Amino acid sequence: MTSTTPKSPAAFTRHRDGEIRAARGTQLTAKSWMTEAPLRMLMNNLDPQVAENPTELVVYGGIGRAARNWECYDKIVESLTNLNDDETLLVQSGKPVGVFKTHSNAPRVLIANSNLVPHWATWEHFNELDAKGLAMYGQMTAGSWINIGSQGIVQGTYETFVEAGRQHYNGSLKGKWVLTAGLGGMGGAQPLAATLAGACSLNIECQQSRIDFRLATRYVDEQALDLDDALVRIAKYTAEGKAISIALCGNAAELLPEMVRRGVRPDMVTDQTSAHDPLNGYLPKGWTWEQYRDRAVTDPAAVVKAAKASMGEHVEAMLAFQKAGIPTFDYGNNIRQMAKEVGVENAFDFPGFVPAYIRPLFCRGVGPFRWVALSGDAEDIYKTDAKVKELIADDAHLHNWLDMARERISFQGLPARICWVGLGQRAKLGLAFNEMVRSGELKAPIVIGRDHLDSGSVSSPNRETESMKDGSDAVSDWPLLNALLNTASGATWVSLHHGGGVGMGFSQHSGMVIVCDGTDEAAERIARVLHNDPATGVMRHADAGYDIAIDCANEQGLNLPMING
């Protein structure tokens, strides 16, 4: 007899050996492509080429998971396998909690991850829930099943470096070098992005295994033996005008202050360690990784205290570089906030990357549009690359990005591509991809999604919505409206998360994914979703008073009652 008594949450399994890879080809394991797609993308998130720690269900970003535990993962797989095209699966913090009758144009999956009532939205309370098996940290694309590995952030980082070069170095980073840290799931994009932007880079990472992975996947070019060796290499390559990325195993909280003491002068300074999560993402100065992980279990308060103190020293070094006239910016990991909490009162003297370099793109709905070939065949991606060039024929910068991506970026898991495009362009591309599936030019359907880091889908006062023109940085109605509109528009799955990127209490954000299966019904959904989704970004920035967004809204015919109604 099957027991009807629920198992205690704490009794579930977080570790399981073995490897998971998404199915390839056209053979369905679910009832339709509408359910096969989320199933494959869930599995793809846990592919060892994609996930940082797949045996623990961790995809990236400290403890960003794809499912709450292995029992939940198994039930999600079972539910998706049996789901009908007029049903919707509800997932609550990585746990499948219900299947409901809806309709064929409704999302097949609705996901809510890590959401806490604001007064309780702290790491301390979340970690209590997590330890009891009652919550899961979904990061952004981990719990929403649309992670594509480091490629997912390469172009955004590249665009940031290019714009910084335009603002500070007359449009060229040749002979310049970037100092940064963190080579995890997101930070691992930095060395390749710097290289593609024409700069050398020195990338500090405390785990040798992460450096090894970035070397193997060609995201970083070489590893230095120590700081002296790294600086010799940097001097040589910058003098030669070469864009070479160098990894250095060490602790940024020790190495950046040492470089300040030596009078070293990078040309740009940033950071992408997992500082948003001091318990799981930032190695304290003077500690070994083993000590750090052991004490995270036995004395978490001491770990958090030591990690934040080290972040304070790290940020003080970044401030010293800024004071010396070196362009310095936060790359969205909330390290400034952590430093301020331990007494670095001027931690926010250097800006975040969005207000400094990216916001004009967001005003036009331009952001990280990504797609994945469910066939598993790289040729499907190359054919879509060509289609993007055909349909957006006059954008040499975009064409250059696609050429560089094909040459330099290794696929992780299912073949995928990302490119930053905006309102009008996204729907055009999605409809074209759907026609390519219909005609048989592509071997299997394509899924289109994006990072939650996008123009209309996130409220994060220390990152995407920092220093908004009207002071609305912390207003989080916008990602909720984005999720609701994507649901009403017919996205295949929609997610609403809290705490991604910058940690508990500091962000709310939403995601969507839509399947191009070549049908007329898909085309109708694609036209709605891929117009409405970026349009919410234009709306949000127009509402805040940005002229670029207001002009874009008028050009695109958006009906914004308080702006142009």
Swiss-Prot record:
It is an enzyme of class 4 (lyase). Pathway: Amino-acid degradation; L-histidine degradation into L-glutamate; N-formimidoyl-L-glutamate from L-histidine: step 2/3. Residues 463-472 have a biased composition (Basic and acidic residues). The active site is at C419. NAD(+) binds at residues 61-62, 139, 185-187, 205, 210, 251-252, 272-276, 282-283, 331, 501. Its EC number is 4.2.1.49. It is found in: Cytoplasm. Binds 1 NAD(+) per subunit. Induction: By cold. Catalyzes the conversion of urocanate to 4-imidazolone-5-propionate. HAMAP family: HutU. This is Urocanate hydratase. It comes from Pseudomonas syringae. The gene is hutU.
